[in-house]
A protein has these predicted regions:
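A charge-rich, low-complexity, intrinsically flexible signal that marks solvent-exposed coils, linkers
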Residues: 1-104
Length: 104
């Protein structure tokens, strides 16, 4: 499943108020899938805030590689917290992920 489809499913589960299904889905995500969603969230945040200073983020995989270099260690150290954020701060995540989905 493509990362955009995972994001749409997360948003659907969140807004359907099916907490049990949402928790089951987020618990079943692999470490790489969570990192992909986290990367998409960070890209959405960059697009939202205009921090790309005129540089257009055109290629998700290239950007993911760039973020991997900068943030993979941070992600590995905080993976459990980031995974928990998928359920506790999901509204904020979805807001930023919306920018990612619109962009790509």
């Amino acid at each position: 499943m493509e990362v955009k489809e995972k994001i749409k499913l997360l948003a659907y589960l969140y807004y359907s108020n099916d907490c049990e299904e949402l928790n089951n889905y987020t618990d079943s995500l692999s470490k790489n899938e969570v990192f992909e969603i986290y990367t998409a969230y960070r890209i959405g945040e960059i697009i939202k805030n205009g921090l790309n200073s005129g540089k257009v983020i055109k290629n998700f995989n290239r950007t993911k590689y760039f973020l991997n270099q900068r943030e993979y260690y941070k992600y590995c150290v905080h993976e459990k917290e980031i995974r928990n954020e998928l359920t506790t701060k999901l509204e904020c995540y979805i807001y930023n992920l919306h920018f990612f989905v619109e962009w790509f």
